[in-house]
């Protein structure tokens, strides 16, 4: 089964990418390795206005990965009470409707503040509901993310790691059931 882990920001050395790496390890542990798509790797030419009409070939690896996936696990930070602009732009650049229609999607949110990206995850649920995705109901919110990652970016909170593992395992089962 092909799960895409989408790191929802292009900020260098982001906590989002660190949490995505933790999830990548968790998916490997549960026997379902996931492929990471990092928005920091988006090709610069996707930002040219002509990309709305014709996507550059360098973007194909991103759209192809989403289209070939059985499910997408999206990790998002909270920027100014919302999702990162780059994440919304990425969603807008993907083929419509086939990128997310009937595709399972899970959400993990993280923030420096106390709400753990509750608002951006709820905003994404609206967007993906509109896109007719199958939304996995078990979300994980990571408040005060700077307090649960060590200097190397490793998660040091066993309870939070268990919640991420439970989410990943549940998402794999959710995707399997929807594939039947």
What are the residue ranges of the model-derived segments?
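Short, glycine-/small-residue-rich phosphate/pyrophosphate-handling segment
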Residues: 104-144, 159
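N-terminal beta1-alpha1-beta2 submodule of the flavodoxin-like/Rossmannoid cofactor-binding fold
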Residues: 1-96, 154-180
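Mobile beta-alpha loop/short-helix "lid" or hinge segments that flank ligand
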Residues: 35-46, 96-98, 131-151
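Short helix-loop-beta connector
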Residues: 101
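Short amphipathic alpha-helical patches
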Residues: 50, 86-89, 110-118, 131-134, ...
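A short, flexible beta-alpha/helix-coil linker loop
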Residues: 9-10, 42-44, 107, 112, ...
